[in-house]
């Protein structure tokens, strides 16, 4: 982090590896249990020599390929917009960045510039999670291509998004018993807050009639890792052939 704060690195794609871009590696941690080992492996071989003065080419290529926003800019443009639920939650206005900046206005564990300057391991530098930032148009070459910066900012300021959910309607549809619903909730999912899931599916929530499969056997990548098993479980719960406490 100290090296990148003082000397951002040019990447083979033409983008720039800054300290803030490096912290976006945190996004991969919830993708699969094996990603923790992969991240540890690449970080242990990041420098060419023990003096931590020069990055290996393999590390720089890894950083280029592990964060695929250049190949998938629509993910960057619409990541926050998919949560814009009508005029109640519009515009998105770079909400993750706004929340981060609010956190670091005073000394905070979230301030990577502060924690990276400390010698003590008691205040480790924290990775970012599944979020996007306006500065990505500067660090990722394709995200800041012709017209892309203006497009990203215009989407962040868009105020006329339609409604995503009708909580009352969902509650009514599930309440009459003709429509059945089942859902998986991963206890250790770093992308989806467990308590919010319990609020939505609990008593009084719009999905209170949903049968809930709560497990810590999987992370966010459950469908990718064991999709057929999870689908069979949920289908059985919804159809009544598999009984669960919920």
Predicted segments with their positions:
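Short, surface-exposed basic-aromatic patches at helix termini and helix-loop junctions that form
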Residues: 199-206, 236-237
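Short beta-strand/loop motif that positions the catalytic acidic residue
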Residues: 174-185
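C-terminal structured domains
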Residues: 183, 201, 208-213
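Short alpha-helix in the alpha/beta-hydrolase fold that links the catalytic acid
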Residues: 42-43, 193-202
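Acidic catalytic loop of the alpha/beta-hydrolase fold
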Residues: 32-33, 188-191
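Catalytic histidine-centered segment of alpha/beta-hydrolase-like enzymes
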Residues: 191, 212-232, 242-245
